[in-house]
């Protein structure tokens, strides 16, 4: 497992990801945390989520806060924050489309792991390979609290890997077959709050429990 993550945008095409450090201000982070607290305070008892390869109703969890931006103006504005857009546009260029948004909140001692996966294979309405995920940290993230891990270069050739059941208690209920050598090459994306990462939608990534 590696902790020296790529911060050079010129290496994105080869590595499949890049970190952008200290993108948001302290005021931005404070506002985001307050808005998130409001969402968590109003979490419903049940949610319909995509898990185990199908839509199903489950007990609500803070990892399943999907699509906040159409309902809450703050999250839409955060998605198009000038500095967030600067990072996103540095890779594919200025013509961007927001496909979806998702807040993943991992409570201490209870946060679910996310098994190895490729984002693109879960976005059934999305076609093409010029697709990236922007992942923004509003709390400090490290391996101890379940930061994201990426296996560099696994997007090359844009393989659509077969999904298999995890058989465990995790966010997706599905994973892909990853060799020990691939896991050894994984990089922990440890970031301070306000930093973000951009990764190719085909690159393998996941995270451990908090």
What do the PLM-derived regions correspond to, one by one?
Residues 103-110, 121, 128-130, 137-143, ...:
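Short acidic/polar capping segments at secondary-structure boundaries
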Residues 71, 99, 130, 144-146, ...:
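Residues that flank catalytic or metal-binding motifs in active/ligand-binding sites
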Residues 74, 87, 134-137, 206:
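Short, hydrophobic/aromatic alpha-helical segments in well-folded domains
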Residues 141-208:
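Double-stranded beta-helix
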Residues 91, 117, 124-143, 190-193, ...:
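Short, conserved beta-strand element in jelly-roll/cupin
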Residues 1-15, 20-116, 120-125, 163:
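Non-heme Fe(II)-dependent double-stranded beta-helix
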Residues 25-38, 138-156:
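Internal hydrophobic scaffold segments of catalytic domains
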Residues 121-122, 131, 201, 205-210:
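Glycine-rich phosphate/pyrophosphate-binding beta-alpha loops
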